[in-house]
Curated annotation (Swiss-Prot):
Pfam families: RRM_1 (PF00076). It comes from Cryptococcus neoformans var. neoformans serotype D (strain B-3501A) (Filobasidiella neoformans). Involved in pre-rRNA processing. Coiled coil: none annotated. Gene3D superfamilies: 3.30.70.330. Residues 24-102, 221-299, 417-489, 535-618, 640-723 form the RRM domain. Residues 179-191 have a biased composition (Acidic residues). GO terms for biological process: rRNA processing. This is Multiple RNA-binding domain-containing protein 1. Residues 165-178, 619-636 have a biased composition (Basic and acidic residues). The gene is MRD1.
């Protein structure tokens, strides 16, 4: 059952403010007193235009003839208000509908108003008492004088008390005199005396005192939110609270029996000040039609009352197993595990090098020592080529399983139910992977390629996926440590999962047929061999909603029609989808038919857009695609030069040549080196290289195959090289030559000026191949 605070319900009944600001919560006034909740809810959903609205909360008070209704967002509430306001839809009188406004923030004056009035009353009371007591003292003094008897002679006790009272009065007068500010000296000016006077009157400013709840928030940076709608997701809640600061974690508990949300959430902020600001601003405000109740959140279980021997590193409590380990290593391990869910820490297709070598060696029927023979001198290249082979097999398997490979990019939104399992040791079976993740929740999909080096696990519930991610991140499996990463959104082509385990043969054939059909559709249609040259028209100004089938249907009635297509490009926001480029081509069997169609189609409207038609130039189509949509393989130009970044400094020219020559013939290879030699006397490489292939196809093949490959543990970053980059390298080389030559010159200052224009070439820089 939904837990609601008694104080929150009473506050909502007591205060019913309305306003002009659009909110997701409405108040209905002047309702019939005989209206029941079921009839009220059915009436709200009865209009056809309001059937799609989502009601998150209803509270009807028939005796007072008003009701509160909450909706998913302000747009839905606006539609309902416009429909029911001023109508007689519920029977009885005219109904008034308005937005419920948030409770105004309490100011300091309102908070202290009661305290100030209380102090004022107490002060007035003390003054009255003193006024009442003063006449009594005078009366006693008058009566003692009028007795005519010496008080000291009549009563020794009275004389003693009188003497003590005199001393006490003198001491009080002396104290009052000492408390008075000293008179200004003669030589002091009026401004100095005024400053001393004001400082004495004002005193020290009082520091604001924090409540216990605020102190708890500042210590934990955590908030507990309740009274949420059941449709609330972690994304929507994080988006609502993230306006006040970065949120590291958003946890929405669900019922263990039904799997339904409980209407509560825990929010972990990165900064404690941001959490306190969100607590003050969003408590008792409206979100998705319900009044939020924000409370301070306690620390996570396991972080409270940490033992004295276990420290806290970056907010993470180190357990007993961290005792005795190095301080630096413990910090690194704790921070890495804590930040594992915040971003992408590894390449999407990262694989264990030992598992790759074992997989390839097992297929070849040899041992790993024979594969990675130290005497051969190219073990790193062999391992990189083996990793490339395994990655190609893995990509092919994932394509057959319905995974969009274009979605495996580092900067894309991450799914809350899909987990990439990396660094798996060789020999791990799909059953062992299922047994590892199944205890944390219901699985809908488990994929493991034949090489067994990378897996994909999908949960039915995002809460189970988050629990498994926290429990299994950096956990040891066999002789390796698991690296987990949240899968990208839109990773699978279809929402329906094929189930746990490998896909069936029938499903595999269906996926292959579907993939083949999509591949055929993506290929440019070739005109009939009998078509004459110059019989293709270029259509410009197409509507971006116009598709190829629709264009074919419209133009197929033209005599001599051969083919028609709309030029498409990949959608960067939705992997696997395509966008129209706004132009297309239509082919005819003869040039005469194309000429007639040119005259007929000029200015013709398709989907509300007027066409611009002209003859297409043979061979110019690819150039036009390259300029507007970009070449999927070659970037902006059909270049044959590749820039390789993130090369390890230990890599030699021989290693790079052997690695890339497996995919094409290299025309040239340049591996720039640093001008200043190292302590050993050798010139270290600068971490990048330029490669030139004989053809663009070979260069594209190498880039596609090696873009996920690691060489000596470093991920190779491949880009198309521009001519300007090589010119910059040459200019930098000449600049370094001039600097060194200027440093070596002796004599006066004029002769030691640096020559940035370069001079006679020498071999000191080692940049030439």
């Amino acid at each position: 059952m939904r837990c609601r605070s008694v104080a929150l319900v009473w506050r909502e009944w007591k205060w019913r403010g309305v306003g002009d600001k659009r909110q997701s919560r409405l108040i209905f006034l002047n309702l019939p007193s005989t209206l029941n909740p079921d009839t009220f809810r059915k009436t709200l959903l009865s209009p056809a235009t309001l059937k799609s609205t989502t009601i998150t909360d209803t509270k009807l008070v028939p005796k007072r003839r008003f009701a509160f209704v909450g909706y998913k967002d302000a747009e839905e509430a606006q539609k309902v208000k416009e429909w029911f306001d001023g109508t007689y839809a519920f029977g009885g009188g005219k109904v008034k509908v308005d937005f419920v406004k948030d409770e105004p923030l309490k100011t300091g004056d309102k908070l202290n108003r009661g305290e100030k009035s209380k102090e004022k009353r107490s002060k007035e009371g003390r003054d009255n008492v003193q006024e009442k007591q003063e006449p009594n003292k005078r009366l006693q003094e008058f009566m003692s004088v009028m007795k005519g008897v010496d008080p000291a002679m009549a009563s020794p006790e009275a004389s003693t008390s009188t003497a003590e009272g005199t001393k006490k009065e003198k001491s009080v007068k002396g104290k009052e005199k000492s408390e008075e500010p000293e008179e200004a000296e003669a030589d002091d000016d009026d401004a100095a005396w005024l400053r001393r006077r004001q400082a004495a009157l004002e005193g020290e400013p009082s520091t604001p005192q924090l409540s216990a709840d605020e102190q708890l928030i500042l210590s934990t940076s955590r908030l507990f939110v309740r009274n949420l709608a059941f449709i609330t997701t972690s994304e929507s809640l994080s988006s609502h609270f993230s306006t006040y600061g970065r949120i590291d974690e958003c946890h929405l508990p669900v019922s263990q029996t039904t799997g339904e949300p409980l209407g509560t959430a825990f929010l972990q902020f990165h900064n404690a000040e941001d959490a306190l600001a969100a607590y003050k601003a969003l408590d008792k405000t409206i979100f998705q039609g319900r009044l939020l109740h924000v409370l301070p959140g306690r620390a996570k279980p396991g972080q409270e009352g940490a033992a004295a021997g276990s420290g806290v590193v970056d907010g993470k409590v180190l357990g007993k197993r961290d005792e005795g380990r190095g301080e630096v290593k413990s910090k690194v391990d704790a921070k890495r595990k804590q930040e594992s869910a915040k971003g992408v820490n590894w390449a999407s297709l990262y694989m264990n090098s030992d598992a790759v070598a074992a997989s390839v060696a097992d297929r070849m029927g040899i041992s790993k020592s024979e594969l990675l023979n130290a005497d051969s001198g190219n073990s790193a290249v062999k391992l990189a080529l083996a990793e490339t082979t395994v990655i190609e097999e893995t990509k092919k398997y994932f394509e057959e399983a319905g995974i969009v490979l274009e979605s495996l990019q580092p900067r894309v939104p991450r799914s809350q139910t899909t987990i990439l399992v990396k660094n798996i040791p060789y020999g791990t079976s799909i059953q062992s992977l299922t047994d590892l993740f199944a205890p944390h929740g219901k699985l809908t999909r488990v994929l493991l390629p034949p090489a067994g080096t990378l897996g994909v696990v999908e949960f039915e519930n995002h809460m189970d996926a988050g629990r498994a991610f926290k429990a299994l991140a950096y956990r040891r499996l066999g002789n390796a440590v698991l690296y987990l990463e949240k899968g990208p959104v839109g990773m699978f082509k279809s929402e329906t999962a094929p189930g746990v385990g490998p896909i069936s043969t029938e499903q595999k054939r269906e996926e292959e047929a579907k993939a083949l059909a999509e591949k055929v559709e993506s290929l440019p249609e070739q005109p009939d061999p009998t078509d004459e040259a110059g019989s293709t028209l270029f259509l410009k100004g197409l509507n971006f909603t116009t598709t190829t089938p629709h264009l074919q249907t419209v133009l197929s009635h033209i005599p001599g029609f051969s083919f028609a297509r709309v030029q498409m490009k990949p959608d960067p926001k939705r992997p696997g989808e395509k966008l129209s480029m706004g132009y297309g081509f239509v082919g005819f069997k003869t040039k005469e038919a194309a000429t007639k169609a040119l005259k007929a189609l000029e200015g013709f409207e398709i989907d509300g857009k007027s066409l611009e038609v002209k003859f297409a130039q043979r061979g110019a189509e690819d150039d036009r695609e390259t300029k507007k949509g970009g070449d999927a393989e070659g970037g902006k130009t059909k270049s044959t030069k590749v820039l390789v970044k993130n090369l390890p400094f230990e890599a030699t020219k021989k290693d790079v040549r052997e690695l890339f020559s497996a995919y094409g013939q290299l025309k040239s290879l340049r591996l720039p080196r640093k001008a200043v030699p190292t302590s050993t006397g050798a010139q270290s490489t600068r971490g990048f290289a330029f490669l030139e292939f004989t053809t663009h196809t070979e260069a594209a093949r190498a880039m596609e195959a090696l873009k996920h490959t690691h060489l000596l543990g470093r991920h190779l970053v491949l880009q198309w090289a521009n001519e300007g980059e090589e010119v910059d390298i040459k200019g930098l080389r000449e600049k370094v030559k001039g600097e060194v030559r200027g440093m070596e010159d002796g004599g006066d200052r004029k002769r030691r000026k640096l020559d940035f224009k370069g001079g006679k070439e020498d071999e000191m820089d080692g940049l030439e191949v």
